[in-house]
Amino acid sequence: MKTISANSQTVKRDWYIIDAEGKTLGRMAAEIAHRLRGKHKPEYTPHVDTGDYIVVINAEKVRVTGNKAKDKMYHHHTGYIGGLKSISFEKLIQKAPERTIETAVKGMLPKGPLGRAMFKKLKVYAGESHPHTAQQPQALNV
């Protein structure tokens, strides 16, 4: 019996939809990262992108536990001297709710070209509507 190694031509990718309303950010992000990598499939291969497409709706209604809404800070640098910017979870969820989920998932994926390819399969939307109805995504309970 030969060992089967997946390649990009043999991988079958499914579409899943997750409703983030009332879900805890970290627990949901861990499951999304797991599925984007393809670790739930028997043909998982570490050096091949075997993951599925994930559509997340209601990103504005995701929750965090404890005082993280006020205390959790997101940092980025503008590239200019003294350009370190910080924003709290509370303000970021009002300004760009998609970024909270995207940042959490991106930190859980591999760093490098393969991780960037996996991240492109994540689609996050603030509200109920999304443009991926033609792909007929299956509901996924996290």
From Swiss-Prot:
Entry similarity comment: Belongs to the universal ribosomal protein uL13 family.
Keyword annotations: Ribonucleoprotein, Ribosomal protein
Keyword Ribosomal protein: yes
Keyword Ribonucleoprotein: yes
HAMAP family named in the record: Ribosomal_uL13
Protein name in UniProt: Large ribosomal subunit protein uL13
GO MF annotation list: mRNA binding; structural constituent of ribosome
Biological-process GO terms, alphabetical: negative regulation of translation; translation
Subunit structure: Part of the 50S ribosomal subunit.
GO-annotated cellular components: cytosolic large ribosomal subunit
NCBIfam families: rplM_bact (TIGR01066)
Record organism: Teredinibacter turnerae (strain ATCC 39867 / T7901)
Function text: This protein is one of the early assembly proteins of the 50S ribosomal subunit, although it is not seen to bind rRNA by itself. It is important during the early stages of 50S assembly.
